[in-house]
Amino acid sequence: MTEEEDYMSDSFINVQEDVRPGVPMLRQIREARRKEEKQQQANLRNRQKSVKEEERERRDIGLKNALGCENKGFALLQKMGYKSGQALGKSGDGIVEPIPLNVKTGKSGIGHESSLKRKAEERLENYRRKIHMKNQNEAKAAEEFRMRLKSKQDEMRLEGDLRRSQRACQQLDAQKNIQVPREAWYWLRPEEETEEEEEEEEKEEQDEDECPSEDLSVLEKLQILTGYLREEHLYCIWCGTAYEDKEDLSSNCPGPTSADHD
């Protein structure tokens, strides 16, 4: 009677492993080949990169080294009087180092990068021009606003000086018993007038041969009225003083305008 087989023994396991010996072996071979191909591709890329680096290094070294006498072109230059290390040109201020090479490594066409650079510079220049024009317009608008404000302030100041002159003229004329002003606008008009008085005054103004006062500007009225005050009453509204005589007025008053008193 044969001995009972031990399924856990090495002989049984080895027999079972050898049932299909080709299947796992093929899988291992394919995996090894795949790894080997990847390694070869990586080595090839590294080798190509190293070749490019070596080419660049050799090129840089060659450009840094001066040409020797064995170079035919350099020998011809020497015969023409050129010396090694000498700058080009009659004045001797030309370049000494060789013109560097710009190796193109990208895939874009020739001139594409320079075109992009030129367009970028144009966009930047247009942006700067717009900013400059905007700043100019803002400065112009601010200056116009200041001028309008100054003009308005000057107009208000002139109107204030005219009212002061009218008030002073009315008081000084009254001191001399002058009942009617030389011109209607020399005195301040009453704040409240009846409609009949206004209509009568309008008729009188229409009958006058001279130009109506409305044709005069505030500045013109002020100049006329201050001249009347100085001539008739020896009075200056900016000094606020009635002088004794014309000599006293001319000696102590700075002048007939507001600017003279600034």
UniProtKB/Swiss-Prot annotation:
<keyword id="KW-0175">Coiled coil</keyword>
<feature type="region of interest" description="Disordered">
    <location>
        <begin position="1"/>
        <end position="60"/>
    </location>
</feature>
<dbReference type="InterPro" id="IPR000467">
    <property type="entry name" value="G_patch_dom"/>
</dbReference>
<dbReference type="Pfam" id="PF13821">
    <property type="entry name" value="DUF4187"/>
</dbReference>
<keyword id="KW-0158">Chromosome</keyword>
<dbReference type="InterPro" id="IPR025239">
    <property type="entry name" value="DUF4187"/>
</dbReference>
<dbReference type="GO" id="GO:0000776">
    <property type="term" value="C:kinetochore"/>
</dbReference>
<feature type="domain" description="G-patch">
    <location>
        <begin position="69"/>
        <end position="115"/>
    </location>
</feature>
<feature type="compositionally biased region" description="Basic and acidic residues">
    <location>
        <begin position="50"/>
        <end position="60"/>
    </location>
</feature>
<keyword id="KW-0597">Phosphoprotein</keyword>
<feature type="region of interest" description="Disordered">
    <location>
        <begin position="189"/>
        <end position="216"/>
    </location>
</feature>
<feature type="modified residue" description="Phosphoserine">
    <location>
        <position position="115"/>
    </location>
</feature>
<dbReference type="GO" id="GO:0003676">
    <property type="term" value="F:nucleic acid binding"/>
</dbReference>
<keyword id="KW-0137">Centromere</keyword>
<dbReference type="Pfam" id="PF01585">
    <property type="entry name" value="G-patch"/>
</dbReference>
<dbReference type="InterPro" id="IPR039249">
    <property type="entry name" value="GPATCH11"/>
</dbReference>
<feature type="coiled-coil region">
    <location>
        <begin position="28"/>
        <end position="61"/>
    </location>
</feature>
<comment type="similarity">
    <text>Belongs to the GPATCH11 family.</text>
</comment>
<feature type="compositionally biased region" description="Acidic residues">
    <location>
        <begin position="192"/>
        <end position="213"/>
    </location>
</feature>
<feature type="compositionally biased region" description="Basic and acidic residues">
    <location>
        <begin position="28"/>
        <end position="39"/>
    </location>
</feature>
<keyword id="KW-0995">Kinetochore</keyword>
<protein>
    <recommendedName>
        <fullName>G patch domain-containing protein 11</fullName>
    </recommendedName>
</protein>
